[in-house]
Amino acid sequence: MSLYDRDYSRSKEFENTRSSELSIFIKQTYQLFAASLLAATVGAYVGIFALASFFIQSQVTFWILFAVEIGLLFALQWKKREAPLNLVLLFGFTFCSGLTLTPLLISVLALPAGGIIIAQAFALTTVAFAGLSVFAMNTKKDFTVMGKALFIVLIVIVAASLLNLFFQSSIVNLAISAVAAILFSFYILYDTQNIIRGNYETPIEGAVALYLDFVNLFVSLLNILRSFNSR
């Protein structure tokens, strides 16, 4: 009987250890996510108040920064386990991501009550993100199986966005933004469940996933609100 008791005790100890490690992992992920949002906010602030003239004069500035942003993201995926380089790359990427939001933010700020529109989009994004995260953590429904379907929809949205660069249709842009808002809402459910189940290798991966979900949902909602307020 004592043998079974010892096995049970060891099993219980292992479960407690794993649960503790997962809790630390989740805590670190959300701390990095919050810090990433702060870095992006600083980037957007610098873009609006220090680099706005460069964005207004030429689109080249945006595309250069966008290329740097993508490069930093790939570098981060490659060096995700190498501290402190991974943190430098993470905050470099999110700061640069904030900079690339400058053209959109400037266009909204040029509208009547543009600041209020941005605040509304941010508030809606925050409430939606919090609500969806809580739902994902408590529901019995498994959203982690939706990865392939979500990725296919993402590819379609990217392709449609690239095509609309040529057509410049406001209706198509509104439709893309609406679908994107729904897509990234599901991505929040998907990524949150992957994080709480420990499916990411590092907290940085989880933080980047949540950051991209939040920012893309914010951009989608901001585009929708801008469309309605510019008519």
Swiss-Prot record:
The keyword rRNA-binding does not apply. Keywords: Cell membrane, Membrane, Transmembrane, Transmembrane helix. It holds the Pfam family Bax1-I. The chain crosses the membrane at residues 36-56, 58-78, 83-103, 143-163, 170-190. It is a multi-pass membrane protein. It comes from the Bacteria. It is found in: Cell membrane. GO terms for cellular component: plasma membrane. Belongs to the BI1 family. This is Uncharacterized protein Cj0236c. It comes from Campylobacter jejuni subsp. jejuni serotype O:2 (strain ATCC 700819 / NCTC 11168).
